[in-house]
């Protein structure tokens, strides 16, 4: 024990950790996780293919047990577990993993549903035909060989591949402190890119991308957008979005829609995808799906998603794209080993490295073939000399006492050149001369001196070779070798010819293995201005109390006489009702203010378009709302102009003014106003800094004051008092009056009135205000107020989902302190909950006759009777 203790050497643990971890990290980076830029293979892939090659497990020979290959790999080349090696083999044999499979498998090698492959003792493999292109010319000293892990075997340091495999099949791996994720590409496109680079070494990225369009995945699908592709090709890093190929089919008889998915994104597990969709439907996070099934078979993939009758297929599909792996992102990180060091490789750098590798391989192959050709020519040269001097040589051999004496005599004597002189004169005296040949051998002083190898070949010559026909064959072979040597020398001495050879081989390779692109590349909102494709039109945007949002063309609604029954604006549940309604243009931005005082952005055209009877789509599926957060106010904005403000009012009477430019950066969820407990936003509007504001309360009060009484504040401020409310009273409407016009006020029970703006006096901020309309049992509380002109129309909506549109001109102008007239007939327990002004009314020829309603027809006189009989119009009285 004491002897052992004396052998212990103290070391600094910090230094030892640094050194050991660095050794481990470099071992993982260089020897395990990252591919070589030249052949696109990691060490384990290289060792598997080499072991199969040594084993003779070729594409045109019988399959061999996977376990046999795995045993050879871990026994000779890869000192790791058999499971890691077998998993590598399995992946190289899966048509959904590699764009061009390198292993031809027989048996169960797993599925796109995530099923595991059968054990290695059950499956059989052999190299695929294209895999041989990675090992082509390996025996011709084209690459360096290095010792295996125990020094008993030699393995290639890199494959002499004819395939730009790093791009063709891609690669992924996680090393220490770095990772790589290179997508597969179409072989034809990549080869065309290589050829374009060979033709013009200064080709731009744009020029290369004319040939290499983008990744081409084995599972096909669709790449959304080219920007991520270009960024990755330019810098080596980028992100692309892969979307499943799906189509919405409609039944001709029932009209019900069905989503059919034919292709899914790369590396997505189909079974888990279907489970996720089912889970989202069960949790009601995705609406509108009635059935889901997998009808995939040997003929291809087919996932069927049946849509409910009242749902819109495109909306459901977009929801699936956003919440499931029907759309995924692929982060491209093109890291590979370049000259033994990890490096981020843009597209052109990868092509340059591959072409440079091919140049080296072809050069080394040419040198090898030249050496072999010269060695063979050297022997044939000696045989030709023997045939030219056949009689003296036969006599010499007959006189020799032994083969050794005969060989020595052949070497010692000088011989006539014969026909060899003419051939060598054409090719050059040194053309076929091996580099190892000593000066005293070969042609010297017009005579020929044989080497030991030539003398032995002459002694081994069979008598039948002495016939005239065999003599001619020998000379013809020698001539062909001289021509081959001349061509090989031309390749070595001419860089242009060398690149021609590389080009010819790439062309031949492309002809043999080319195929069509599978993955479609489409433009998306990041590449084109989607607004250029959206028709500008005015639409009605509705948001229900339970958060269902939609828009529909304004033209869907026909103007009616006041007192009409109205048309249903939305199909809603009994416990739901329309909470917010506004008119906007499809190109406007909707600023969505939440109950928590946060602001979210959406373009109007990004909202779901639905029919008048449809519920729309939950806004929580469109905006990243937090738990218990709901949208309480929405405002359309076209441009973020300097000098303009957003003026906000809360139910408790607080007002706040913030510069519009502070909301121009579209980051969802930023704070718009700091709300007190129990308070909420009831209105927002745009101002120019010199406007006035009017706050209307549920108890019929109104205060009008100058906007300048409210200073501009930051987004996170709470605001100041706008009106002094009494008791449980709350603010229901905010109006920023424009011009003269009138104020139209509506109560819960469908009554309302029109009063000139000038009737409302301007007071100080934070006062109790004056009467806006009489609140009574007949009228109910105030629902809202809007500013109107005589040419306008108004929309009113009830908590039962009924909407009526009527002309403002049909509502009489009365004083401020009055009860008003009937604007909409409400059923028992039905109340008006929303009011909106509509400009530029649509002409309706039927309005001059009978009022058009759903379910019944009422004469005009019935609607007018209420004015003469029941309405109480009183003078202005504060």
From Swiss-Prot:
Which Pfam family name is an example for this entry? DNA_gyraseA_C
Q: Name one GO cellular component term.
A: chromosome
Task: Please report the stretch or stretches of sequence annotated as the Topo IIA-type catalytic domain.
Answer: 34-533
Listed under GO biological process in this entry are: DNA topological change; DNA-templated DNA replication
Where is the major localization of this protein? cytoplasm
Matching CDD domains: TOP4c
Per its database record, what is this protein's job?
A type II topoisomerase that negatively supercoils closed circular double-stranded (ds) DNA in an ATP-dependent manner to modulate DNA topology and maintain chromosomes in an underwound state. Negative supercoiling favors strand separation, and DNA replication, transcription, recombination and repair, all of which involve strand separation. Also able to catalyze the interconversion of other topological isomers of dsDNA rings, including catenanes and knotted rings. Type II topoisomerases break and join 2 DNA strands simultaneously in an ATP-dependent manner.
Write the protein's name: DNA gyrase subunit A
What is the protein's species of origin?
Pectobacterium carotovorum (Erwinia carotovora)
The gene coding this protein? gyrA
């Amino acid at each position: 024990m004491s002897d052992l203790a004396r052998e212990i050497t103290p070391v600094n643990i910090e230094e030892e950790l640094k050194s050991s971890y660095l050794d481990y990290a470099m071992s993982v980076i260089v020897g395990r996780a990252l591919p070589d830029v030249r052949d696109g293979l990691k060490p384990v892939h290289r060792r598997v293919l080499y072991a199969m090659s040594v084993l003779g497990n070729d594409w045109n020979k019988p399959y061999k047990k996977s376990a046999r290959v795995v045993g050879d790999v871990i026994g000779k080349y890869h000192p790791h577990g058999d499971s890691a090696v077998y998993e590598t083999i399995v992946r190289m044999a899966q048509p959904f993993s590699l764009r061009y499979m390198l292993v031809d498998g027989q048996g169960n090698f797993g599925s796109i549903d995530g099923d595991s492959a059968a054990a290695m003792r059950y499956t059989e493999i052999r190299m695929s035909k294209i895999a041989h292109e990675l090992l082509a010319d390996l025996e011709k000293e084209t690459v360096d060989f290095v010792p295996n892990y125990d020094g008993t075997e030699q393995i290639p340091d890199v494959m002499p591949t004819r395939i730009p495999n790093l791009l063709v099949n891609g690669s992924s791996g996680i090393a220490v402190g770095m990772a790589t994720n290179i997508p597969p590409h179409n072989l034809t496109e990549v080869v065309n890119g290589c050829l374009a680079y060979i033709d013009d070494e200064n080709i731009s990225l744009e020029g290369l991308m004319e040939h290499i369009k983008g990744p081409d995945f084995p599972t096909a699908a669709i790449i959304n957008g080219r920007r991520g592709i270009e960024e990755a090709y330019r810098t080596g890093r980028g992100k692309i979005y892969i979307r499943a190929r799906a189509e919405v089919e409609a039944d001709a008889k029932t009209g019900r829609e069905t989503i059919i998915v034919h292709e899914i994104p790369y590396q997505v597990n189909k079974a888990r995808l279907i489970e996720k969709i089912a889970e989202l439907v069960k949790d009601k996070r995705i609406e509108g799906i009635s059935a889901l099934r997998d009808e995939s078979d040997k003929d291809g993939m087919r996932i069927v998603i049946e849509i409910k009758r009242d749902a819109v297929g495109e909306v459901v599909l977009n929801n699936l794209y956003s919440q499931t792996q029907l759309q995924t992102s692929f982060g491209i990180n093109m890291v590979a080993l370049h000259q033994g060091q990890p490096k981020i490789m843009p597209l052109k750098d990868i092509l340059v490295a591959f072409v440079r590798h091919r140049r080296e391989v072809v050069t080394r192959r040419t040198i090898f073939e030249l050496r072999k050709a010269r060695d063979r020519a050297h022997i044939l040269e000696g045989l030709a000399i023997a045939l030219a001097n056949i009689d003296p040589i036969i006599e010499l051999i007959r006189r020799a006492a032994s083969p050794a004496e005969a060989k020595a005599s052949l070497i010692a004597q000088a011989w006539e050149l014969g026909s060899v002189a003419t051939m060598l004169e054409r090719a050059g005296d040194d053309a076929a001369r091996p580099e190892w040949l000593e000066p005293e051998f070969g042609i010297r002083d017009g005579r020929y001196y044989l080497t030991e190898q030539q003398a032995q070949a002459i002694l081994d010559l069979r008598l039948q070779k002495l016939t005239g026909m065999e003599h001619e064959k020998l000379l013809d072979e020698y001539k062909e070798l001289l021509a081959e040597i001349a061509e090989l020398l031309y390749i070595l001495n001419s860089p242009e010819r060398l690149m021609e050879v590389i080009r010819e081989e790439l062309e031949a390779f492309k002809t043999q293995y080319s195929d069509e692109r599978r993955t479609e590349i489409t433009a998306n909102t990041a590449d084109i201005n989607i607004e250029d494709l959206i028709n500008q039109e005015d639409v009605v945007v509705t948001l229900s109390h339970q958060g269902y949002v939609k828009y529909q063309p304004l033209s869907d609604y026909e103007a009616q006489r006041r007192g009409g029954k109205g048309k249903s604006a939305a199909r809603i549940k009994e416990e739901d009702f329309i909470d917010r309604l506004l008119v906007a243009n499809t190109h406007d931005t909707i600023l969505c203010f939440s109950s928590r005082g946060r602001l979210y952005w959406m373009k109007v055209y990004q909202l779901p378009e639905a029919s008048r009877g449809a519920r729309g789509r939950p806004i929580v599926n469109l905006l990243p709302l937090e738990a218990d957060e709901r949208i309480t106010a929405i405002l359309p904005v076209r441009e973020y102009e300097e000098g303009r403000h957003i003026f906000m009012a809360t139910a408790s009477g607080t007002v706040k003014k913030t510069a519009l430019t502070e909301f121009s950066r579209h980051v969802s969820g930023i704070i718009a106003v700091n709300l007190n407990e129990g308070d909420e936003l009831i209105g927002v509007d745009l101002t120019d800094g010199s406007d006035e504001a009017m706050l209307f309360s549920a108890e019929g009060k109104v205060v009008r004051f100058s906007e300048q009484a409210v200073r501009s504040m930051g987004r996170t401020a709470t605001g100041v008092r706008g009106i002094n409310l009494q008791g449980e009273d709350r603010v229901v409407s905010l109006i920023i009056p424009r011009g003269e016009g009138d104020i139209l006020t509506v109560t819960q029970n469908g009554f309302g009135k029109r009063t000139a703006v000038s009737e409302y006096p301007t007071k100080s901020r934070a006062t109790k205000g004056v009467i806006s309309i009489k609140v009574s049992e007949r009228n109910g509380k105030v629902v809202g107020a809007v500013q109107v002109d005589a040419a306008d129309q108004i929309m009113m909506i009830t908590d039962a989902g009924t909407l009526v549109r009527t002309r403002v001109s049909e509502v009489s102008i009365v004083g401020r302190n009055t009860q008003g007239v009937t604007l909409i007939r409400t059923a028992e327990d039905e109340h008006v909950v929303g009011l909106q002004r509509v400009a530029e009314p649509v002409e309706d020829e039927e309005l001059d006759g009978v009022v058009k309603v759903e379910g019944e027809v009422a004469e005009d006189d019935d609607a007018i009777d209420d004015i003469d009989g029941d309405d109480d119009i009183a003078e202005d009285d504060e």
